Amino acid sequence: MQIKDIVKKVKQIEIRTRKKTEATLMGQYHSAFKGQGMTFSEVRPYQFGDEIRRIDWNKTARFREPFVKVMEEERELTMMLLVDISASMDYGTKTQLKREYVAEIAASLGFSAAGNNDKVGLILFADKVYKVIPPQKGRKHILSIISTILTADYVPAVSKIDKAMEYMMGIFKRKSLVFLFSDFEDEYDSKMLRVASKKHQLLGMRIFDEKDNEIPDVGYTLLYDAETGQQVWANTSSARWRYTFAEAQKQKLRALEEDFANSSASFMNINTGSDYSKLLYNYFQKK
């Protein structure tokens, strides 16, 4: 992608996602995610009905009249976007690639966070962590994240989700909102999901193209795994073969859903042709 094409694409995503964000998601996001507790705001004279435990005894003694501490919700949060950049994510049979779809969802989440003055960071991973953008605030930062997702070099390697999670937990000690984007084509250590969800608020997003789950009838054809480089001939005209493939994909999805449920983490299965804003809205409502 040339620079002018990147700029154009980022701008298009910003226009589309900000409209969706402002119309539906931002309010739900604010309501759904609570901050890290209460923080001190100011001291003022005591008023009837104020809680006794809020009295500032030092200032009360000094001025010989009661003063109370005013507390406010500490709203600032950190959102981390973990994006799989293995080669299978650079694929799509619809109007956009999986990576482009991820960039749109990331933009919606990012602008929702920015609207609430929260920080957003990015980790790109495949077989290892390839890039980290530390959490920051603001529109320009979100646009930089979108551009990074769109222009990343997608890696012909098996994705190691558990390594990315372990890395994230090693550098972010404070509870964060963690959104994990992948097609989950490769194996991972489910124990890491449980460890991560105990500390962070975790949502896994399986991004898939409708052709990921089915193989068309095109006779004998050479199937190629973009991540491992393996090739195998298959008779796609065989109804039994196509059925076995489809059932294996369904079983993989069921196991994935169970892993997240058993880890007390949230999970979404999102087709690149679907309206992700409705799914996010429903997710925020349930939090």
Say what each PLM segment does.
Residues 58, 154-158, 180-182:
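Short, flexible loop segments at the rims of nucleotide/cofactor-binding pockets, characterized by
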Residues 126-130, 186, 274-276:
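Short, internal active-site loops enriched in acidic
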Residues 1-33, 42, 167-174, 192-287:
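Von Willebrand factor type A / integrin I
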Residues 80, 123, 179, 203-205, ...:
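Hydrophobic/aromatic beta-strand patches that form the interior of the parallel beta-sheet core
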Residues 181-188, 202:
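Active-site glycine- and acidic-residue-rich loops that bind
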Residues 141-176, 188-189, 209:
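Von Willebrand factor
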Residues 132-147, 239, 258-261, 285-286:
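Short, electropositive alpha-helical surface patch
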Residues 1-130, 135, 177:
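An amphipathic, basic-hydrophobic helix/alpha-beta surface used to engage anionic
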